[in-house]
């Protein structure tokens, strides 16, 4: 096992409990922390979620059952964690929390390796104050109340934990923010035959300690205990991986196809950047066909490029690989693709109308992107009323694709120019009214 000497740490740390038997997942043939959901093992997903949620301190992974395999996976994948072996793990996961504490800073998160959360839930937890904070969900969507630990709440505090509470107000979401000095007082409660994390929580309440409730209020999360849970968890992850800024074409048409493509890409070595390049290549090929007068085939490839353009973001969000650098890379390729498609359609049409409509169409496409980028750089997030119909790339590409498929390139270019320039003008007028 790796070196276990205590070192100095900055910020909030985390203990990831990964020592249990995972008996109902044994048919998968690997330790539970190494079961895969949407392209990542449960352990990788937990570590990436914590980091993406803003956790900066050391992450301690506590192993027990088949611990050498889990530790080897951490090393092979280059996970930035400290692995700590807990020989006492058969007594319960409470012993894993105690085993991790001496390697952790004063405030730390306790995360279950078999619970899947979004980074936003971690951010919400880290904003809470208290010696013991529990993430709870009063409006669970994915988690099974028959499997999860239930909680009873009073005045924003958890007053009771239990699997079989007849009356309860929410579910324990398996994510906690704790104070190490406070929990050290519970070591004296650790001498029994069994010591689960629920036992420690109840001991904390019995000692007069308060458990602050951090309500996730319907945020997507679930716990994974069975092969069926693995499948349901992947559906959940793909559901939240869709962009929240979809236009109507993406929302009602493209996502239904891109999600199926992304599902097949999750366990491949393809990166989101490579998928961005694939989308650009399809757009460039479609533009070339449009310029050569092959309008129907070119239009079909333009729409396919639009569908694949959604896969890079889905893949990045599902694998927790999103980054500002990747967003800039994708946006730059998109602008080049737009210019090629509009130019190709204008050239391939061979009419004065299409040639004349090419410039305003290209200007409108670029201005929609440019005004949004400048707005958000100077003023923060653009209000959703300025990112609707005509201001989304999916609509623009659908109009251009239809122009090729229906043999109406001039009309498609005129519509694209009108939509884009009208939206850019609307944004400018809104800014002017805001200054006056």
Curated annotation (Swiss-Prot):
Membrane protein topology class: Multi-pass membrane protein
A Pfam family reported for this protein in Swiss-Prot or TrEMBL: CDP-OH_P_transf
GO CC terms, sorted: membrane
SUPFAM superfamilies assigned to the protein according to its UniProt record, in alphabetical order: Nucleotide-diphospho-sugar transferases
Residue sites binding CTP per the record: 17-19, 32
Transmembrane intervals: 275-295, 349-371, 397-417
Top class in the EC scheme: transferase
Region (CDP-alcohol phosphatidyltransferases): 242-435
Key words of the record: Membrane, Multifunctional enzyme, Nucleotidyltransferase, Transferase, Transmembrane, Transmembrane helix
Source taxon at top rank: Bacteria
GO molecular function: nucleotidyltransferase activity; phosphotransferase activity, for other substituted phosphate groups
Keyword Calcium: no
PROSITE patterns, A to Z: CDP_ALCOHOL_P_TRANSF
UniProt catalytic activity: 1D-myo-inositol 3-phosphate + CTP + H(+) = CDP-1L-myo-inositol + diphosphate; CDP-1L-myo-inositol + 1D-myo-inositol 3-phosphate = bis(1L-myo-inositol) 3,1'-phosphate 1-phosphate + CMP + H(+)
Its EC number(s): 2.7.7.74, 2.7.8.34
Predominant location category: membrane
Gene Ontology BP terms: phospholipid biosynthetic process
Leader peptide range in chain numbering: none
InterPro entries in alphabetical order: CDP-OH_P_trans (IPR000462), CDP-OH_PTrfase_TM_dom (IPR043130), CDP_ALCOHOL_P_TRANSF_CS (IPR048254), GlmU-like (IPR050065), MobA-like_NTP_Trfase (IPR025877), Nucleotide-diphossugar_trans (IPR029044)
Location(s), subcellular: Membrane
Region (MobA-like NTP transferase): 11-241
Function: Involved in biosynthesis of di-myo-inositol phosphate (DIP), a widespread organic solute in microorganisms adapted to hot environments. Catalyzes the condensation of CTP and L-myo-inositol-1-phosphate into CDP-L-myo-inositol, as well as the biosynthesis of di-myo-inositol-1,3'-phosphate-1'-phosphate (DIPP) from CDP-L-myo-inositol and L-myo-inositol-1-phosphate.
Similarity annotation: In the N-terminal section; belongs to the MobA family.
Protein name: Bifunctional IPC transferase and DIPP synthase
């Amino acid at each position: 096992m790796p070196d276990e000497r205590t070192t100095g740490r900055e910020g909030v740390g985390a203990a990831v409990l990964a020592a249990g038997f995972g008996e109902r997942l044994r048919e998968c043939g690997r330790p539970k922390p190494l079961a895969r959901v949407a392209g990542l093992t449960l352990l990788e997903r937990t570590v990436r979620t914590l980091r993406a949620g803003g956790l900066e301190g050391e992450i301690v992974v506590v192993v027990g059952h088949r611990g050498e395999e889990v530790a080897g996976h951490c090393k092979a994948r280059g996970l930035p964690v400290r692995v700590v072996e807990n020989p006492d793990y058969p007594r319960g996961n409470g012993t894993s929390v105690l085993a991790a504490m001496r390697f952790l800073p004063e405030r730390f998160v306790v995360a279950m390796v078999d619970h899947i959360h979004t980074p936003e839930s971690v951010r919400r937890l880290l904003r809470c104050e208290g010696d013991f904070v529990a993430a709870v969900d009063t409006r669970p969507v994915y988690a099974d109340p028959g499997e999860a630990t239930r909680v009873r709440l009073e005045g924003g505090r958890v007053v009771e934990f239990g699997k079989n509470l007849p009356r309860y107000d929410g579910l324990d979401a398996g994510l906690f923010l704790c104070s190490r000095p406070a929990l050290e007082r519970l070591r004296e409660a650790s001498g029994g035959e069994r010591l689960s994390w629920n036992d420690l929580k109840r001991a904390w309440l019995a000692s007069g300690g308060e458990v602050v409730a951090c309500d996730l209020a319907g945020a997507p999360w679930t716990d994974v205990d069975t092969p069926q849970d693995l499948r349901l968890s992947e559906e959940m992850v793909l559901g939240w991986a869709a962009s929240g800024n979809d236009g109507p074409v993406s929302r009602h048409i493209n996502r239904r196809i891109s999600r199926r493509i992304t599902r097949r890409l999750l366990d491949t070595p393809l990166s989101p950047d490579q998928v961005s390049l694939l989308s650009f290549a399809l757009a460039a090929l479609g533009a070339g066909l449009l310029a050569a007068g092959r309008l129907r085939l070119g239009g079909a490839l333009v729409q396919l490029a639009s569908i694949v353009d959604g896969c890079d973001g889905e893949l990045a969000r599902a694998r927790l690989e999103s980054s500002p650098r990747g967003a800039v890379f994708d946006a730059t390729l998109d602008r080049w693709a737009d210019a090629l498609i509009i130019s190709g359609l204008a050239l391939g049409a061979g009419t004065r109308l299409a040639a004349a409509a090419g410039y305003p169409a290209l200007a409108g496409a670029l201005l929609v992107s440019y005004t949004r980028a400048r707005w958000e750089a100077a003023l923060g997030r653009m209000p959703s009323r300025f990112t609707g119909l005509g201001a989304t790339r999916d609509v623009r590409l659908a109009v251009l694709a239809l122009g090729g498929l229906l043999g109406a390139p001039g009309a498609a270019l005129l519509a694209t120019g009108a939509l884009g320039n009208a939206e850019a003008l609307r944004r400018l007028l809104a800014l002017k009214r805001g200054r006056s």
